[in-house]
């Protein structure tokens, strides 16, 4: 076929020579002729040309490998180690205990610093190295809006939402009861419950009742909220295994499910946001409107409107803020609750002890309207679960916004992803004797030491508490999450006995190819009602 095409070109050149056509005109005529005579071959040639062009663009625009720029070693090069991040950081700890190294994760390169750099990295300002930029990058935030939190949203969560926690405890207790009744129900006999999926729905419902009201929160909203992170993570994981040259083409396609979910969420939110905006504009006393009450939903939309500058608080922006809040408050809280339920399921005696603590602080069946610091045993168990089964092997994720020189290692150019090895903080024998042992009262005993009463709590941050991050960019929603978790755990303890099937071991977390620990989606726990 190629010889025929060459002959056609020569014949066409000779035949059309008297017309004195330009090369471009001649090429167009020749291409049309080839397509008529060899349509399949022409399409194949066009496809190969496009692939070749993409490859050339990829090679020309490909950034230099980070190891070539920084001169740091790269770990995890073999197929076996590429996704086994636990083995990677164990190797990193052994070979480079005091210096950084590079790992490849989901198509990106991370500079991993040892734990001794924790305090130095946490002190970096957002203008120097941004956590928000990191999450925006790894979740393709230009499409999904993840990691696009505004200052108004950040302050609303860190200040207004945190202050509202005590007053909402009684209402949240009702919301948790509604959620458990719907998704677990009354179990006179042991009932197997797929634990992560169920905890996702329960957390989504309990939180949604506070943010968007009980009517919306107990409708289809929890199911839609549950779909958002799954659709985003599907896109992220898919793109991470696709060659770089095809990602721009596939990105809009693999993100279609996430965009459709967001569209549905905006549609559900629209009437409530419109009503909230009208109430805020009509309010004669906005200070009174901004006060959270025990009943009803939080004035979350109004808090945002009060913090935005004139013209910024559009209905679209407010809906985006609600989407981000739902995304960030559901998955991490549900994964933590999943692990806590499993830790209770393998320790019946712990259930009895924590149940007694809950009963001692309740009055007329109600938890106190506080931050629930009274539940010291429960808090210690939660903190120990969080230590043994954290979100990830790393912490203090950042992307540098300008060149940064730390006390050791090379100067990091702008756009570098860095993080800290938090696994070897959580599993430090120096900090936590017998770190492999689950000790539910480990932190209760630490708080009994002189001067440590307010330390070592579930929401604590610091060089020995890496999982929430630290510094000015620590997780702002941890106080709200703490309340949701304690209310849900209290409900489980009072209403159910939980266990695993006889002979079954505690399901293990799964290492993802980006250093994150993922739950076993098929894991089940037996629930049996206590009355």
From Swiss-Prot:
GO annotation (BP), single: secondary metabolic process
Cofactor(s) listed: heme
Record pathway: Mycotoxin biosynthesis
SUPFAM superfamilies: Cytochrome P450 (SSF48264)
Top-level taxon: Eukaryota
Annotated CDD domains: CYP503A1-like
EC id: 1.-.-.-
Localization: Membrane
Class of enzymatic activity (EC top level): oxidoreductase
Alphabetically ordered keywords of this record: Heme, Iron, Membrane, Metal-binding, Monooxygenase, Oxidoreductase, Transmembrane, Transmembrane helix
InterPro entries, A to Z: Cyt_P450, Cyt_P450_E_grp-IV, Cyt_P450_sf
Membrane-topology annotation of the record: Single-pass membrane protein
Transmembrane segments: 40-60
GO cellular component: membrane
Binding, heme: 475
An example Gene Ontology molecular-function term: heme binding
Known role: Cytochrome P450 monooxygenase; part of the gene cluster that mediates the biosynthesis of the cytotoxic leucine-containing cytochalasans, including aspochalasin C, aspochalasin E, TMC-169, flavichalasine F, aspergillin PZ, aspochalasin M and flavichalasine G. The first step in the pathway is catalyzed by the hybrid PKS-NRPS ffsA that utilizes 8 units of malonyl-CoA to iteratively assemble the octaketide chain before addition of L-leucine by the C-terminal NRPS modules. Because ffsA lacks a designated enoylreductase (ER) domain, the required activity is provided the enoyl reductase fssC.
Annotated family: Belongs to the cytochrome P450 family.
Protein name: Cytochrome P450 monooxygenase ffsD
Organism: Aspergillus flavipes
High-level lineage: Eukaryota, Fungi, Dikarya, Ascomycota, Pezizomycotina
Gene: ffsD
């Amino acid at each position: 076929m190629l010889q025929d095409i060459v002959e056609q070109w020569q014949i066409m050149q000779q035949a059309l020579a008297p017309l004195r056509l330009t090369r471009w005109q001649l090429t167009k005529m020749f291409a049309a002729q080839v397509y008529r005579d060899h349509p399949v071959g022409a399409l194949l040639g066009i496809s190969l040309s496009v692939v070749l062009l993409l490859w050339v663009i990829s090679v020309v625009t490909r950034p230099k490998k980070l190891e070539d720029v920084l001169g740091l070693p790269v770990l995890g090069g073999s197929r076996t180690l590429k996704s086994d991040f636990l083995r990677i950081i164990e190797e990193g700890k052994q070979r480079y205990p005091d210096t950084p190294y590079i790992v490849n994760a989901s198509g990106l390169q991370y500079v991993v610093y040892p734990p001794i750099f924790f305090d130095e990295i946490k002190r970096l300002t957002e203008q120097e190295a941004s956590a928000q930029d990191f999450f925006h990058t790894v979740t393709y935030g230009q499409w999904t809006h993840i990691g696009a939190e505004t200052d108004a949203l950040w302050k609303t969560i860190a200040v207004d939402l945190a202050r509202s926690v005590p007053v909402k405890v009684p209402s949240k207790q009702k919301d948790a009861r509604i959620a458990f009744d719907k998704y677990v129900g009354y179990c006179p006999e042991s009932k197997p419950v797929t634990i992560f999926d169920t905890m996702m729905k329960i957390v989504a419902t309990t939180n949604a009742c506070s943010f968007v009201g009980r009517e919306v929160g107990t409708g289809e909203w929890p199911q839609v909220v549950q779909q958002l992170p799954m659709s985003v993570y599907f896109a992220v994981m898919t793109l991470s295994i696709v060659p770089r040259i095809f990602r721009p083409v596939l990105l809009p396609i693999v993100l279609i499910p996430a965009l459709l979910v967001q569209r549905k969420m905006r549609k559900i939110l629209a009437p409530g946001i419109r009503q909230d905006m009208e109430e805020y504009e009509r309010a004669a006393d906005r200070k009174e409107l901004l006060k959270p009450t025990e009943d009803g939903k939080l004035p979350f939309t109004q808090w945002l409107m009060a913090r935005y500058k004139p013209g910024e608080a559009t209905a679209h922006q407010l809906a985006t803020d609600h989407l981000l809040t739902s995304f960030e408050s559901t998955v991490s809280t549900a994964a933590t609750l999943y692990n806590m339920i499993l830790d209770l399921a393998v320790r019946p005696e712990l259930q009895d002890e924590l149940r007694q603590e809950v009963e001692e602080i309740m009055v007329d069946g109600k938890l106190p309207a506080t931050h629930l610091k009274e539940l010291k045993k429960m808090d210690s168990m939660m903190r120990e679960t969080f230590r043994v089964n954290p979100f990830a092997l790393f912490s203090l994720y950042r992307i540098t916004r300008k060149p940064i020189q730390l006390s050791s290692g090379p100067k990091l150019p702008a756009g570098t992803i860095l993080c800290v090895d938090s696994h070897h903080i959580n599993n430090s024998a120096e900090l936590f004797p017998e770190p492999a042992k689950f000790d539910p009262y480990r932190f209760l005993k630490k708080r009994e030491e002189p001067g440590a009463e307010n330390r070592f709590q579930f929401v604590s941050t610091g060089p020995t508490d890496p999982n929430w991050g630290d510094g000015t960019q620590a997780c702002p929603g941890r106080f709200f999450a703490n309340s949701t978790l304690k209310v849900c755990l209290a409900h489980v303890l009072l209403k159910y006995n939980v266990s695993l099937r006889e002979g079954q071991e505690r399901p293990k977390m799964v290492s993802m190819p980006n250093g994150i620990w993922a739950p076993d989606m098929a894991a089940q726990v037996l629930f049996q009602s206590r009355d």
